[in-house]
UniProtKB/Swiss-Prot annotation:
It is found in: Nucleus. One of its GO terms (molecular function) is chromatin binding. Ubiquitinated by WWP2 leading to proteasomal degradation. Acetylated. May be deacetylated by HDAC6, HDAC10 or SIRT1. A zinc finger (C2H2-type) spans 278-302, 308-330, 336-358. This is E3 SUMO-protein ligase EGR2. Residues 237-248 have a biased composition (Polar residues). Sequence-specific DNA-binding transcription factor. Plays a role in hindbrain segmentation by regulating the expression of a subset of homeobox containing genes and in Schwann cell myelination by regulating the expression of genes involved in the formation and maintenance of myelin. Binds to two EGR2-consensus sites EGR2A (5'-CTGTAGGAG-3') and EGR2B (5'-ATGTAGGTG-3') in the HOXB3 enhancer and promotes HOXB3 transcriptional activation. Binds to specific DNA sites located in the promoter region of HOXA4, HOXB2 and ERBB2. E3 SUMO-protein ligase helping SUMO1 conjugation to its coregulators NAB1 and NAB2, whose sumoylation down-regulates EGR2 transcriptional activity.
Length: 410
């Protein structure tokens, strides 16, 4: 802080004042006292845009009077500007209040601050208040705030991933959903050609199963001992075009004959005929079943209905156990292990077929020692090697060798 006192008598001081800060002319017999306070403020802690070395006039006062400065005269009360940019405005102009009315016309009022919406709960201030250069109260520079850019639209949450449903019949397909409303002019909707492949096959109608369950026993068998009579609905026509005309099949599903005949067509069943009241309605098929679900599963052979679909390769199956074993080909699960070698299989019939190999090998090993043991007693019999052989003796007369053969008679 530097205090400068300048007193002069009967002559004005030749000080370079700006045009807006010119001193007031006074009579020759008055004594003027000029007092100025100049301070060099450091950089504001809250604002990093003010460069160092800038002299900021915090306050300036002109005391006028005949009495010395120590006397109590009317002086101007100066209020320092707050470092808050909201109080100083966007241009950082210091505000001063004067008590003398004759000094009001020397100072131009500072420009009004921009209307801040502090009551509306805005959390961010105008960036132009921090980017503007500091100026004094005597001069103001025209400063244009930087252009404002529209804020970008919030991006979609990356966690919201559209899921493709397993059955598009129950859920809308992803190509029909538009999260942003109507598509743009350059965007064309995807035709979704694969939707037809993902549609599951139609299931067996519940009415068909109910009719076979409730109407089969009454139509096929009338009593516990009745084995003849009508055996349920039959087909009319021939070949694959044959359809049922009975009320047990309201949807008239075509029942195709089995192209590959059974290996044992006349194989007797363990269950008596009167305990199998559900005959197959297909013409030329003599199968009968004791349970309605067995008949429903058998009818799928004639109709070709495959209601069980693999969700990995979209292959269809007529039986659920076939689908279960098929899924193991994708997952690599092999729950059936061989009891002899520990080899694992995905199907029980494969393990059963493999076990037969070990059983045949075991039979061969057990039969080999018994055959070798039975061959030894036959070789070591009475007579030894002479049995079945020829007896040769030398003649004492010097004649030729006389050989007589002797064979064993049974």
């Amino acid at each position: 802080m530097i205090n400068i006192d300048m007193t002069g008598e009967k002559r004005p001081l030749d000080l370079p004042y700006p045009s807006s800060f010119a001193p007031i002319s006074a009579p020759r017999n008055q004594t003027f006292t000029y007092m100025g306070k100049f301070s060099i403020d450091p950089q504001y802690p809250g604002a990093s845009c003010y460069p160092e070395g800038i002299i900021n006039i915090v306050s300036a006062g002109i005391l006028q009077g005949v009495t010395p400065p120590a006397s109590t005269t009317a002086s101007s009360s100066v209020t320092s500007a707050s470092p808050n940019p909201l109080a100083t405005g966007p241009l950082g102009v210091c505000t001063m209040s004067q008590t003398q009315p004759e000094l009001d016309h020397l100072y131009s009022p500072p420009p009004p601050p921009p209307p801040y919406s502090g009551c509306t709960g805005d959390l961010y201030q105008d960036p132009s208040a921090f980017l503007s250069p500091p100026t004094t109260s005597t001069s103001s520079l025209a400063y244009q705030p930087p252009p404002s850019y529209p804020s970008p639209k919030p991006a979609m949450d990356p966690g919201l991933i559209p899921m493709i449903p397993d059955y598009p019949g129950f859920f809308p397909s992803p190509c029909q959903r538009d999260p942003h409303g109507a598509a743009g002019p350059d965007r064309k909707p995807f035709p979704c050609p694969l939707d037809s492949l993902r549609v599951p096959p139609p299931l067996t109608p519940l009415s068909t199963i109910r009719n076979f369950t409730l109407g089969g026993p009454s139509a096929g068998v009338t009593g516990p001992g009745a084995s003849g009579g009508s055996e349920g609905p039959r087909l009319t026509g021939s070949g694959s075009a044959a359809v049922t005309t009975s009320p047990y099949n309201p949807h008239h599903l075509p029942l195709r004959p089995i192209l590959r005949p059974r290996k044992y067509p006349n194989r007797p069943s363990k269950t008596p005929v009167h305990e199998r009241p559900y005959p197959c309605p297909a013409e030329g098929c003599d199968r009968r079943f004791s349970r309605s679900d067995e008949l429903t599963r058998h009818i799928r052979i004639h109709t070709g209905h495959k209601p069980f679909q693999c969700r990995i390769c979209m292959r269809n199956f007529s039986r659920s156990d076939h689908l279960t074993t098929h899924i193991r080909t994708h997952t690599g699960e092999k729950p059936f292990a061989c009891d002899y070698c520990g080899r694992k299989f995905a199907r029980s019939d494969e393990r059963k077929r493999h076990t037969k190999i070990h059983l045949r090998q075991k039979e061969r090993k057990s039969s080999a020692p018994s055959s070798s043991a039975s061959a030894q007693p036959s070789a070591s019999g009475p007579g030894g090697s002479q049995a079945g052989g020829s007896l040769c003796s030398n003649s004492t007369i010097g004649g030729p060798l006389a050989c007589t053969s002797r064979t064993r008679t049974p």
